[in-house]
Amino acid sequence: MFLRHVIVFSFIALLAGCAGFGARESVEGHGNPAQWAANKQHLTGLDGWQIDGKIGIRAPKDSGSGTLFWLQRQDYYDIRLSGPLGRGAARLTGRPGAVSLEVANQGRYEAPTPEALVEEQLGWKLPVSHLAWWVRGLPAPDSKSRLTLDGNSRLANLDQDGWQVEYLSYAEQNGYWLPERIKLHGSDLDVTLVIKTWQPRKLGQ
């Protein structure tokens, strides 16, 4: 059961990248589209961070929560999970082409991509690689999205690839307005992410 939760939590193990403002986005809401484009460009340059927080999941047969540490350095990530689901700890590391999941007292699992790891272990097809974008308050660039902006021209809601993402609060850190609380609603599970501390960094191209 713990491994099942860990794989779901591995949504967070993702790759940073680049995105432009384009026709794949449908923008509505109270914000200013031009200001959103500027905000998006600013956030897209953020390619490194350290996050400490909590994550929870609710599925038809499973629910639970745990603590989260997420280190991102451009295309490399190091995700560590512990807490009530832990019975030990889990660590997910990877970069393009190689993802590794280590679970205390259970073993090591590998796959070429986070999506492949989730499908292999759970049989679920999920947009895993979107999470590095969503956690920054950005839509993923490789598929269509519908955005609702708040009065500050930041994401309030995002619909993408069958997922609804709610941005409940933001905080300013080192010149970036970043999400503090996010809820993700999929067809058969809900994920809640509460970020206690953000340490954003722009590492370069």
UniProtKB/Swiss-Prot annotation:
One Pfam family per UniProt: LolB
UniProt membrane topology term: Lipid-anchor
InterPro entries: LolA/LolB/LppX (IPR029046), OM_lipoprot_LolB (IPR004565)
Alphabetized PROSITE patterns for the sequence: PROKAR_LIPOPROTEIN (PS51257)
Annotated signal sequence range: 1-17
Main subcellular localisation: membrane
Lipidation (N-palmitoyl cysteine): C18
Gene Ontology CC annotations of this record: cell outer membrane
Any GO BP annotation: protein transport
Localization annotation: Cell outer membrane
Domain of life: Bacteria
Gene3D superfamilies, alphabetized: Lipoprotein localisation LolA/LolB/LppX
Claim: Protein transport is one of the keywords in the record: yes
Residue positions bearing lipid (S-diacylglycerol cysteine): C18
Keywords, alphabetical: Cell outer membrane, Chaperone, Lipoprotein, Membrane, Palmitate, Protein transport, Signal, Transport
Quaternary assembly: Monomer.
Entry-linked HAMAP family: LolB
Family recorded in the similarity comment: Belongs to the LolB family.
Function per UniProt: Plays a critical role in the incorporation of lipoproteins in the outer membrane after they are released by the LolA protein.
Name of the molecule in the record: Outer-membrane lipoprotein LolB
